[in-house]
């Protein structure tokens, strides 16, 4: 109960202060109906800003619910995702990496997640067997209840699907009894692909809409940490509003729940349930 009350106190800071009393009450009731427990989640991000744009709301929301959320950034996006920094002149790759590291750490702290960096490079992102084993070891350590990563296809950025395949292959290795025998293996956490920049070209179709209204302000604060990609701030604000409208429509426009902002995900594996409601 102490943990639940602490979560609710934190939640108050994340909610808008005017015009959302009904939303606040509904969200508090939802938090109270999900007891805080030792649960965890893993986010595998190709570049150091991807987890913020595409899953920042999910991270903040589950952190509020008591999940330990851990982010793995495979690269800093130092070559292909830091144009604004390079245009300043007199920049080096190491200097760009340092800026990107600090941005991602600040964003993760706002969202309530821990973060680590594999620093395997970008444009192109490439991974050897040791990198795969390193990620499998993260799975073993975190024991995630669910995983968030990139779409399986992205013709605009080959780093993204490679990150997705790494996340899934490492999951399989972490499930194998013969990999580091004696360690606790990973179960079968569901994997959700977060929204790519241009979903129509990525064969990505959402089947999960997540209400992130209660944590939107936190997500936008995290977005603003990404100074190297300021041109994307308002784009992802529009995406969140659009997904919020769609989420509201999918629960029925007469529903009392006031959804404003949302995130969308595509599940890879079937959901196993005892209740279809």
Walk through the language-model features, giving the residues of each.
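Extreme N-terminal basic, low-complexity initiation segments
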Residues: 2-8
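Active-site rim/loop-helix segments in enzyme catalytic domains that contact anionic ligands
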Residues: 11, 20-142, 266, 274-275
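The feature marks non-catalytic terminal segments
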Residues: 31-36, 186-277
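Internal alpha/beta domain cores that form substrate/cofactor-binding pockets in large enzymes
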Residues: 70, 114-196, 204
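Short, solvent-exposed loop/turn segments at secondary-structure junctions
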Residues: 76-78, 153-154, 198-199, 215
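Short helix-coil transition/hinge motifs at the ends and kinks of transmembrane helices
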Residues: 85-91, 181, 251-255
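Non-transmembrane alpha-helical segments in soluble domains
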Residues: 105, 168, 220-224
């Amino acid at each position: 109960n102490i943990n639940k009350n602490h979560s609710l106190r934190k939640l108050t800071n994340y909610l808008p202060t005017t015009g959302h009393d009904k939303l606040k009450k509904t969200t508090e009731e939802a938090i109270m109906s999900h007891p805080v427990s030792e649960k965890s989640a893993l986010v595998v991000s190709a570049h150091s800003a991807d987890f913020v744009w595409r899953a920042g709301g999910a991270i903040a929301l589950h952190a509020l619910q008591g999940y330990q959320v851990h982010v793995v950034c495979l690269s800093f996006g130092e070559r292909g995702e830091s144009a604004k920094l390079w245009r300043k002149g007199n920049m080096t790759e190491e200097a760009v990496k340092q800026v990107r590291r600090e941005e991602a750490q600040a964003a993760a702290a706002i969202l309530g997640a821990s973060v680590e960096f594999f620093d395997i490079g970008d444009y192109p992102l490439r991974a050897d067997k040791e990198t795969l084993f390193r990620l499998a070891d993260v799975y073993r350590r975190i024991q995630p209840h669910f995983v968030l990563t990139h779409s399986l296809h992205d013709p605009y950025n080959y780093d993204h699907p490679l990150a997705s395949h790494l996340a899934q292959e490492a999951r399989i290795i972490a499930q194998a009894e013969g990999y580091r025998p004696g360690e606790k293996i990973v179960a079968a956490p569901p994997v959700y692909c977060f929204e790519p920049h241009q979903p129509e070209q990525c064969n990505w179709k959402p089947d999960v809409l997540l209400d992130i209204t209660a944590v939107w302000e936190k997500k936008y604060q995290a977005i603003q940490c990404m100074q190297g990609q300021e041109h994307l701030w308002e784009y992802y604000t529009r995406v969140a509003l659009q997904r919020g409208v769609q989420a509201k429509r999918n629960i029925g426009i007469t529903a009392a729940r006031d959804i404003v902002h949302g995130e969308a995900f595509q599940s890879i594996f079937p959901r196993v349930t005892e209740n279809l409601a």
